[in-house]
Amino acid sequence: MEIKRVGSQASGKGPADWFTGTVRIDPLFQAPDPALVAGASVTFEPGARTAWHTHPLGQTLIVTAGCGWAQREGGAVEEIHPGDVVWFSPGEKHWHGAAPTTAMTHLAIQERLDGKAVDWMEHVTDEQYRR
């Protein structure tokens, strides 16, 4: 058994290459080999969001606070709230973040394939975000 204590892993700022706006990433766990799963708590300030991206084995989001938006390529922007669970299929291009006037926090859980859990793409434009 291994216990990760709260605060044992430093918070980090979401890199500008992958995020628009102010985003804080609090790593929660990365299971040791041979397990592939990792998780983090991610907080988006109002209007902050990820760039478009995919996950080779999919991603689960569990909204814990605030109000957010999520969109898959070709789909509508969906509003998400605490308690909502969002699943993105492997390879599904998507983004997620806070609503324009409200912060949002979610748990993000994904698995690694050949050591990689995410493929980052272009930023979500303001026009795409405001749809």
Swiss-Prot record:
Known outcome of mutating residue 120 to R: Increases activity towards both enantiomers for 2-chloromandelonitrile in vitro
Function field: Hydroxynitrile lyase which catalyzes mandelonitrile formation from benzaldehyde and hydrogen cyanide with high stereoselectivity in presence of manganese.
Result of changing residue 96 to K/D: Results in a soluble but inactive enzyme in vitro
Known cofactor(s): Mn(2+)
Manganese among keywords: yes
Family assignment from sequence similarity: Belongs to the cupin domain-containing hydroxynitrile lyase family.
Effect seen on changing residue 42 to A: Increases enzymatic activity and enantioselectivity in vitro
Domain Cupin type-2: 42-104
Activity-pH dependence: Optimum pH is 6.
Catalytic activities: (R)-mandelonitrile = benzaldehyde + hydrogen cyanide
Organism whose genome encodes this protein: Granulicella tundricola (strain ATCC BAA-1859 / DSM 23138 / MP5ACTX9)
Keywords: Lyase, Manganese, Metal-binding
Outcome of swapping residue 50 to A: Does not affect mandelonitrile synthesis in vitro
Impact after mutating residue 109 to L: Increases catalytic activity and enantioselectivity in vitro
Binding site for Mn(2+): 53, 55, 59, 94, 96
Name listed for the protein in its UniProt record: (R)-mandelonitrile lyase
InterPro entries, sorted: Cupin_2, HNL-like_cupin, RmlC-like_jellyroll, RmlC_Cupin_sf
E.C. designation(s): 4.1.2.10
GO molecular function: lyase activity; metal ion binding
Reported impact of residue 29 to L: Increases enzymatic activity and enantioselectivity in vitro
Result when mutating residue 96 to R: Results in an insoluble protein in vitro
UniProt keyword DNA-binding, yes or no: no
Top EC category: lyase
Pfam families, sorted: Cupin_2
